Amino acid sequence: MAIKKPAIFLDRDGVINDVIDRGENFFVYGKKVRWTAPFKFNEFKLKTGIAEILKLIGQSGFLRILVSNQPDITYGTMTLPEHEKIMAEVKKLPLDDIFICVHGRDDNCECKKPKPGMLFSAAEKHNIDLSSSYIIGDTQSDVSAGQAAGCATVLVDSIYNQDVTADIRIKNLADIIKII
């Protein structure tokens, strides 16, 4: 039997790219939100140095797996062509695989974080040892998915997640290199 590998699961919005401040009175699917994913390609901006950070993670022996909820397609706040343009840029990054859930919160799927379905699917596909893996995110749903899968949880610090508790809190993604 092949040796199981460790992975670093990464959320997309708020971890590898900037989130968008929509202001105090913005609603998506009936829920008031301030910080969102980019809805259009011209709003999409990768974090500085992300490609190099991902290379270093890979050189440290970890698989790099993107696990991202993208319900804005379902909610109608993002078109499929805009999503595809954004994902074309993401696919240029040194990632080993990408798992996307486009379901809305009412769809009751197993893949949408905080459920761990995307992590379990990646673990099965890539023979990943979840107990020696990390999930890096910026929301409670990222932390909850990692906890449910048995991963160490890492939170990228932000103004909107001060009430979220994870195993490790970092200022930016580059800080993970010191930890792994």
Question: Which role fits each region the language model picked out?
Answer:
Residues 37-40, 71-72, 103-105, 127-128:
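A short, structure-level motif marking secondary-structure boundaries and short turns
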Residues 2, 78-97, 106-135, 139-180:
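Asp-based, Mg2+/Mn2+-dependent phosphohydrolase catalytic module
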Residues 1-61:
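Active-site neighborhood of HAD-like aspartate-dependent phosphohydrolases
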Residues 15-17, 73, 142, 161:
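Active-site loop signature of alpha/beta-hydrolase-fold enzymes
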Residues 7-9, 65, 134:
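Hydrophobic "anchor" residues on beta-strands that sit immediately upstream
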Residues 10-12, 68, 137-138:
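Active-site flanking residues adjacent to catalytic metal/cofactor-binding acidic residues
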Residues 13-15, 70-71, 115:
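Anionic group-transfer/hydrolysis microenvironments
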Residues 50-87, 95-104, 146:
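Substrate-recognition element of Asp-dependent hydrolases with the DxDx(T/V) motif
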